[in-house]
Regions:
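Short, Lys/Arg-enriched, disordered terminal segments
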Residues: 1-8, 524-525
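Structural boundary/hinge residues at secondary-structure and domain interfaces
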Residues: 6-12, 16-161, 207-227, 244-346, ...
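Exposed, polar/acidic Ser/Thr-rich sequence context and nearby capping/turn residues
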Residues: 38, 442-443, 525
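An internal, short helix-loop-strand segment that often contains or flanks glycine-aspartate motifs
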Residues: 73-106, 143-248, 261, 265-273, ...
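Extracellular/lumenal glycan-associated surfaces
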Residues: 126, 184, 346-347, 351-355, ...
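Short beta-strand-to-coil "C-cap" segments at the C-terminal boundary of structured domains/repeats
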Residues: 248-253, 518-525
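Active-site proximal loops enriched in glycine and acidic residues that flank catalytic Cys/His/Asp
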Residues: 285-288, 351-353, 428-430, 441, ...
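C-terminal regions of mature proteins
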Residues: 498-522
Length: 525
């Protein structure tokens, strides 16, 4: 971006911050007179939003972030233009604000929308009804001559548009009690629709429950909508080297929901680090006790079984039945880098067996029955592969989505190879992945020896219902291996979170599921 463009953005951003300052001033002024406008900012948020950020004290939040090692990430990565503007120019606003202007940001929302670019947000803040004229005067007084302020009507409501050069336009809509600002005219139109029709995010009963369950009075909150867990309310806490988000899930009570599957599971303990190669950058652990629920949920989200034939569906069902009868406790899905950095990463499922001999006999019987029923030689083959001086018996399974469903990898194909190694069943998309894993383990190249891993795993509860740990920077390098178990909101903003390690735990207590996300900053200087 050239210097002229940056100057233009600073000027228009200054208007935005003046609006916010004015909003805080008038809100404070209104309190002293005894009655505020009472606008519920959530009633303006379009119902299709993916996340909502809320703070009642932006000034304190920015001061706290300024002292954190990861604070600079907010301005150096394309997370949100609106958020970046607020952070970049807050001190400038403080120095230039009119005398007596309150800088305590009392109520502020930012809603996030698809497709998740840095312009797909809307900022909302309250103002005192009747003081819109003051805001207009500030705009006219500070507006550069070469930036004519435009306006258009949408359903009888005026949208003000300020061209910022290039393809950037700052749009805002003001009405009695509030102002909404965005770099997207489309989103401002959706705000108007929600305001007129009343069809806002508050009409979502699950979101309403999430909002009602808010108990913490932290400096900021985040409401995140996920396909697997519904609306999550998360309270934000900022440590020196980590961002902590903890709260509660509010998924609807449906028999096939992921959250309700977790409610039926017994807590599990984390696997030892000696089963993961030292180059592992992604791992997840799930209980197998309610594997049918997990499979149904996965099928209904990213990897829709409806696009496959009856043979694939039948194979999935029978493999799930086989696993439930043989698995001991929980399973782990993980991805690790090869010794050759040029090669793609490898992904596997590692599943402890109750009795490996019985499990292998059951798998042979399953493959034999599938071949007879389908009258096909596709899959169902036994092959020998060698590594070093040892041979390993691989079972080439019939086409199935089982690997994708349980590993969480979005783009996994239907080929799955099974191998019994020690007391575990390994499932992989190809024999090379499994053999590479065995080579790493046999050489003693395990993550248990890594000091950073030990530090990160120390944040994990001793008992949980599911766990995901990943280096988001490495995960971003291989989008085809992106996991559906990463919350959508954070996947959409991977450029910001790429300098963090993510720990995502779900813990069930008294049939309520509590998510705990920890973003550990990787200060690699």
């Amino acid at each position: 971006m050239d210097r002229k463009m940056k100057i233009k953005i600073v000027v228009v951003t200054f208007f935005l911050l003046l609006f916010i300052g004015a909003g805080s001033y008038f809100f404070t002024s209104l309190n002293t007179r005894g009655k505020a406008a009472g606008i519920n900012l959530f009633s303006l948020v379009p119902s299709d939003c993916s996340a909502i950020f809320e703070t009642n004290d932006l000034a304190s939040l920015l001061r706290e972030l300024k002292g954190k090692s990861y604070g600079k990430e907010l301005t150096t990565h394309g997370f949100s233009l609106i958020a970046k503007d607020l952070i970049d120019h807050f001190e400038e606003l403080t120095a230039s604000a009119p005398s007596g202007l309150s800088l305590r940001m009392n109520k502020l929302l930012i809603s996030f929308h698809s497709p998740g670019t840095e312009m797909d947000q809307v900022l909302y803040f309250p103002i005192n009804p009747g003081d819109e004229k003051w805001i207009e005067e500030q705009i006219q007084k500070k507006r550069p001559i070469d930036f004519p302020l435009k306006s258009v009507l949408y359903k009888g409501k005026k949208i003000n548009i300020c061209p910022m050069g290039g393809d950037l336009f700052l749009c805002y809509y003001k009405s009695s009690g509030f102002v909404a600002v965005s770099y997207s005219k489309r989103l401002i139109e959706q705000v108007i629709d929600a305001h007129i029709s009343g069809n806002s995010v508050l009409t979502d009963k699950v979101f309403g429950f999430a909002k009602d369950t808010k108990t913490a009075n932290g400096i900021a909150s985040l409401y995140v909508k996920e396909k697997q867990t519904g609306w999550n309310y998360l309270n934000l806490k900022f440590d020196d080297d980590a961002i902590n988000l903890s709260g509660i899930t509010t998924d609807a009570e449906t028999s096939s929901s992921f959250v309700n599957a977790i409610k039926e599971q017994s807590p599990i303990e984390p696997f030892s680090g000696n089963i993961f190669p030292s180059s592992t950058y992604y791992m997840n652990q799930l209980s197998i006790s309610q594997i049918q629920y997990i499979a149904v949920n996965s099928a209904q989200t990213e990897y829709d079984l409806a696009s496959y034939g009856d043979d694939v569906k039948a194979t999935d069902i029978q493999l799930m039945y086989f696993l439930k009868g043989n698995v001991a406790g929980s399973l782990a899905g993980f991805s690790f880098c090869s010794d050759d950095s040029i090669q793609r990463p490898f992904s596997l499922l590692c599943i402890p067996m109750q009795n490996s001999m019985k499990a292998e006999a059951d798998l042979r019987l399953f493959m034999q029955n599938r071949s007879i029923k389908t009258e096909s030689t596709a899959g169902g083959k036994i092959q020998l592969f060698y590594t070093g001086n040892r041979s390993y018996r691989f079972y080439s399974l019939p086409p199935s989505t089982i690997f994708s469903q349980l590993s969480g990898i979005k783009d996994a194909d239907l080929n799955t190879y099974a191998l019994f190694y020690k007391d575990k069943l390994l499932l992989a998309p190809d024999p090379v992945s499994a053999l590479s894993y065995i080579n790493q383990i046999e050489k003693g190249n395990i993550i248990e020896k890594d000091s950073i891993y030990k530090k990160n795993i120390s944040h994990v509860d001793t008992h949980f219902n599911s766990l995901l740990m990943t280096d988001l920077g490495k995960l971003a390098l291989y989008p085809e291996y992106r996991s559906r178990l990463i919350p959508d909101f954070f996947s959409q903003h991977m450029s910001f979170f790429s300098n963090f390690i993510l720990l995502n735990q779900l813990v069930c207590r008294d049939r309520k599921v509590y998510p705990n996300l920890i973003f550990i900053y990787k200060d690699e200087k």
